[in-house]
Each structure stands twice: as C-alpha cells, then as structure tokens.
C-alpha cells in the first residue's frame, strides 16, 4: 500500500451554489457568496462624479453593488472629456450626474442607478438626513469644511464614509466610521488551529491508538499523519522536561531531531512534514493578545443596544473563561497531509466534532445573553454564530478617529516623526499641502495655480498658508520643501485620469472590505505620491 497525500477535497463535498453566478465567478473566489450578497444589498452614494469618483464607482458597479446614487450639480464641460471616461462629446452641457450615471448603468444593468443634480456641499448643509438611507458614502473632492460636516452626519446616522481626493500627482483615501468589526479577516498567513500542544480528550484518545514504534509493515509507518506524530512527540518531550515544551533555539532543534529519530526510512514524507510543521508545537497556547484585548473591551459588557458582534464577543469571553479553558472555539479544519485515508478521515471527524461542540456551547451562551438583555434569543442567525466561531482567533476591530478630531487635536508627535523621516516626509508634506490648499481656496476663492498668471504669488501664498497650518498643528519651526510647494501649485487642483483611476481603485477596494466585512481596511490616511511613486499610510 502506497502513502498518499490526503486533502480536504477528497473527503468534503464542495458547496453547491443555489444560483450560478458566472458573471461574478472570479470575485466569488475571493469573498464568497456571503460577501457577494452583502455587496448586492449595499446602497452606495457618490458625491462628485469627476474622474476620481467615476473610477471608484465603476469598480463597484462591475462588482455588482446593489444600488448607486450619484450626486453632482455641475454640467459636463469640454475639459471633462480628457479625464473622465464616463462622459462623451454628446454629454457636453448636460448634467454630469445624469451622464455618468447612464454610462455606469451600461456597465451592469443589474445595478439600480440613480442621480441627483445638486451640489454636494449644499446637500450636506441643507439636507443632512439624506445620507441616512445609504450603506456607505464615497465623498470625492470635498474641501475641509464639507468633510468635517459630512463626517459628523455619517457618524450620527451610523453610515460608513470613505473620503477620496485626487489632486494633480497626489491623492488620499481616508475611511471614517465609529467602529468596524471584522469576523472573516482573511489574514495572509495564520497558524492552523491544530492544538498540537494542548490536545482535547478525543484527540488524545485517537493519538494513543497509534503506535509510532511499530515499523512493520513499513507502509503503515508512512501513513501516520503528522498531527499524530507531533502530539505524541510533544507529550514525550513534556514528560522529560518537567511539563515544558521547547522554547530555546537549541531545544527546538533537539525536538526536531527527536522527531527525525523516529523515522524508519528516508522516504517517509509524513515525518518530513512533521519536522517542517514542528514550529506549530512551539506556538503559545490560548488566545492572542489582540483577541484578549477584544474580550476585555468595555463594549463586551453588553446591553440592549449592543450589536450582534459584541453579543458574540461576550459569549466568547464566557467560553474562554469556562469551557474553552483559555482557548477559543476550535476552527475544525485540518490541512492536507500525507496519511492513509482512514486516518485522515478519522482525524477530520475528530476536529469537526470538537468544532461543532464548541459552536453549540457558544450558540447557547449567545441565546442566554440575548435573553438577559431583553432581545430575541434567535435574533442572531446560526450561520453568523458559526462563522464567528470558525474565525474567533482572527477577529479584528477597527476604530477610526473623527476627521474633526484629527484636524483639531492633531497628534503632534506623529506628525513630527513623519516629517523627520526621509521615507515618509513626502507623504506628510502632501497631507499638509492638501489641507493648506483648502485653506488657500477658502481665503482666495481659488486653488493655488488654478488659473494662468500669478503663479509666483500663489507659491508665496501657499507657503505662508502651509507654515500657518504647521504652527496650528503644533509643529513650530517645521518647514516643507520649496520643490513640493512649487509642484502643488503646478498641479492647479487638476484631476489627472491616471492618478484618479489609481486612487479611485484604492477607494473601491476599501469600500468592498467595509461592505463585505472581510479583509482588514486601512487604518489611517492613505497618501499617494505620484512624484516619488509611493503609496503610504499615515496613522494620525
């Protein structure tokens, strides 16, 4: 009998889709049907549909977002034909919102597309309740005053906000939302939840039925899964080391040598896998510091207004302190490995059974908590709780400062650190100058370098404005490079299509993260520096 590498594919049925969605096949592989459903239920509002906004919304329309509302009070001009693919020569003189909306609708007829011919700045001031109907607002090319007002409005209405700006060869993207919990964070690299150094009774019992010292028949020795090998080796090591596992480099090497010593022949792939996976034995037990911080958060003390996420976190806290014995619920999946079919299936059943048992405990605790706070015990669906349990070790929570707080109460230490850092000084310079440009516009009714003539005067004025802003930020004595100020004036507040497409693409990527509640969105202000070809995140 020959050893074969067993995979989940061989023993698990692939989920079948209720309705084939070949249209979105590629993206379904990334965020799945649950993510796609969230996208199709989302209602997105775009403020200003210049090239930056059009490019951001284009990506979402192609992705199958449920509905879009385009808000812009301007008319299409000849200049728009050179930087916005969502208008054409026939659109000149017509409503920009209407033209862009029509072109976007052509890209995906299943999206519900609407437009409103109104200046976004006016709408923000006169009709703040308008924004409460949306899942998320993408606000492009807004000046500082409008950004601050809109941020307050969206926070009060619990609507997610993404601020986007393209300005010459620079741009920024800034997310603003009170808090954004992520259950399925999809980390690039994460340790398998195998509990090799902390096996539960059923796994222990299974491991004890297999003897590593039996070398005949040779095929049987080659079929022992590495999970079994490592659980046994970890136990053997602990017995001879006062219950401790390898911790130093020398001990870890010694442990691997111990595993290697159990090999009968040099062609045993299962033992090679065990040696490669030995680091999983050295991993610390229990939950991560990040999850610990989450269950210790004041929001985990739930009340009738708590979100489903915090109710489940409260249940997780109880589980970790009781049934879990310091551990989160087991994920229940095992990786591919060299094994006999029988061993692999038995092992898989043991992991799945433990995961199901942990889920049932969490589910019961969720129901009890809901009952205690006066809510319907069945108000959180079973699939949601199951997903929470499966991803309990990977939970993330993003909290964002209000834009007003960032502007009015700046983190002086961080700003000075970025300005002094050769690698980040360009990004910080653009952050300052983008804000200075808005002050400039408020004072002189135009952006620096926006009109022909008077460039030298605009450069001088922008420099003075930037220095004044730096002083207000608590950075007395700090200066920005003259070259950067000159470039900012040369930009003339233009939206260059290639920059708009890039910045708009980044914005739409973050929107998808926020809507699907998968992957971790950016924390901070993303700055695109087209001069130095850099993308950097400023945490202010």
Swiss-Prot record:
Disruption phenotype: Impaired meiotic recombination characterized by a shortage in bivalent formation due to a mislocalization of class I crossovers (COs) and correlated with strong synapsis defects. Dwarf plants, highly branched, with small crinkled leaves, small flowers and short fruits, symptoms of fertility defects.
Pfam family membership, one: ThiF
SUPFAM superfamilies from the UniProt entry: Activating enzymes of the ubiquitin-like proteins
Subcellular localization, as worded in the UniProt entry: Nucleus
Tissue-specificity statement: Expressed in shoot, root and floral meristems, in vascular tissues of cotyledons and mature leaves, and in the stele of the root. Expressed at higher levels on the lower side of an emerging root during germination and at higher levels on the underside of the apical hook.
Molecular function in Gene Ontology: NEDD8 activating enzyme activity; nucleotide binding
Keyword check for Nucleotide-binding: yes
A cellular-component GO term for this protein: nucleus
Known pathway: Protein modification; protein neddylation
Gene Ontology annotations of biological process type: auxin-activated signaling pathway; DNA repair; leaf morphogenesis; protein neddylation; reciprocal meiotic recombination; response to cytokinin; response to water deprivation
InterPro entries: APP-BP1, ThiF/MoeB/HesA, ThiF_NAD_FAD-bd, Ubiquitin-activating_enz
Range of residues in the leader sequence: none
Keywords of this entry: Auxin signaling pathway, Nucleotide-binding, Nucleus, Ubl conjugation pathway
First-listed, main subcellular location of the protein, grouped into a coarse class: nucleus
Main function: Regulatory subunit of the dimeric ECR1-AXR1 E1 enzyme. E1 activates RUB1/NEDD8 by first adenylating its C-terminal glycine residue with ATP, thereafter linking this residue to the side chain of the catalytic cysteine, yielding a RUB1-ECR1 thioester and free AMP. E1 finally transfers RUB1 to the catalytic cysteine of RCE1. Plays an important role in auxin response. Regulates the chromosomal localization of meiotic recombination by crossovers (COs) and subsequent synapsis, probably through the activation of a CRL4 complex.
Similarity section: Belongs to the ubiquitin-activating E1 family. ULA1 subfamily.
Complex and partners: Heterodimer of ECR1 and AXR1. The complex binds to RUB1/NEDD8 and RCE1.
Name used for this protein in its record: NEDD8-activating enzyme E1 regulatory subunit AXR1
Organism, scientific name: Arabidopsis thaliana (Mouse-ear cress)
């Amino acid at each position: 009998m020959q050893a074969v590498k067993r995979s989940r594919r061989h023993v698990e049925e692939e989920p079948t889709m209720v309705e084939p969605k070949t249209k979105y096949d590629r993206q379904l592989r990334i965020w799945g049907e649950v993510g796609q459903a969230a996208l199709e239920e989302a209602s997105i509002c775009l403020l200003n549909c210049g090239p930056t906004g059009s490019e951001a919304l284009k990506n979402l329309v192609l992705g199958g977002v449920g509905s879009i509302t385009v808000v812009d009070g301007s008319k299409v001009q000849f200049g728009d034909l050179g930087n916005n693919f969502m208008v054409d020569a026939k659109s000149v003189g017509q409503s920009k919102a209407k033209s862009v909306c029509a072109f976007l609708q052509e890209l995906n007829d299943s999206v519900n597309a609407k437009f409103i011919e109104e200046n976004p700045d006016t709408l923000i001031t006169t009709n703040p309740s308008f924004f409460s109907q949306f899942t998320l607002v993408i606000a492009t090319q807004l000046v500082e005053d409008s950004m601050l007002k809109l941020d307050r409005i969206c926070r009060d209405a619990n609507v997610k906000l993404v601020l986007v700006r393209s300005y010459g060869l620079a741009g920024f993207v800034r997310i603003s939302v009170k808090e954004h919990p992520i259950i399925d964070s999809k980390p690039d690299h994460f340790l398998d939840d195998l509990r090799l150094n902390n096996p539960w009774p059923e796994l222990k019992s299974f491991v004890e039925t297999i003897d590593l010292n039996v070398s005949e028949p040779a095929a049987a020795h080659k079929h022992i899964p590495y999970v079994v090998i490592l659980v046994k080796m970890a136990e053997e090591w602990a017995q001879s080391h006062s219950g401790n596992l390898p911790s130093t480099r020398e001990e870890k090497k010694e442990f691997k040598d111990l595993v290697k010593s159990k090999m009968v022949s040099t062609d045993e792939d299962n033992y090679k896998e065990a040696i490669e996976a030995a680091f999983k034995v050295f991993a610390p037990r229990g939950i991560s510091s990040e999850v610990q911080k989450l269950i210790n958060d004041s929001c985990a003390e739930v009340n009738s207004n708590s979100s489903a996420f915090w109710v489940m976190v409260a249940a997780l806290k109880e589980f970790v302190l009781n049934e879990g014995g310091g551990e989160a619920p087991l994920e229940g999946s095992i990786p591919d490995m060299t094994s006999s079919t029988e061993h692999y299936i038995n092992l898989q059943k043991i992991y799945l059974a433990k995961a199901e048992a942990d889920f049932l405990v969490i589910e019961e605790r969720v129901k009890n908590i809901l009952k205690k706070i006066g809510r319907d015990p069945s108000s959180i669906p079973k699939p949601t709780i199951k997903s929470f349990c499966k991803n309990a070790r990977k939970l993330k929570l993003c909290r964002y400062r209000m834009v007003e707080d960032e502007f009015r109460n700046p983190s002086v230490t961080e700003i000075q650190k970025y300005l002094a850092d050769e690698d980040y000084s360009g990004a910080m310079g653009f952050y300052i100058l983008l804000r200075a440009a808005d002050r400039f516009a408020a004072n002189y009714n135009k952006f620096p370098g926006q009109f022909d003539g008077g460039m030298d005067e605009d450069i001088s004025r922008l420099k003075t404005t930037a220095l004044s802003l730096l002083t207000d930020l608590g950075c007395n004595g700090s200066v920005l490079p003259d070259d950067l100020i000159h470039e900012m004036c040369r930009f003339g507040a233009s939206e260059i299509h290639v920059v708009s497409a890039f910045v708009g693409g980044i914005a739409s990527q973050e929107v998808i993260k926020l809507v699907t509640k998968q992957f971790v969105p950016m924390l901070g202000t993303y700055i695109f520096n087209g001069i130095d070809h850099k993308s950097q995140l400023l945490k202010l």
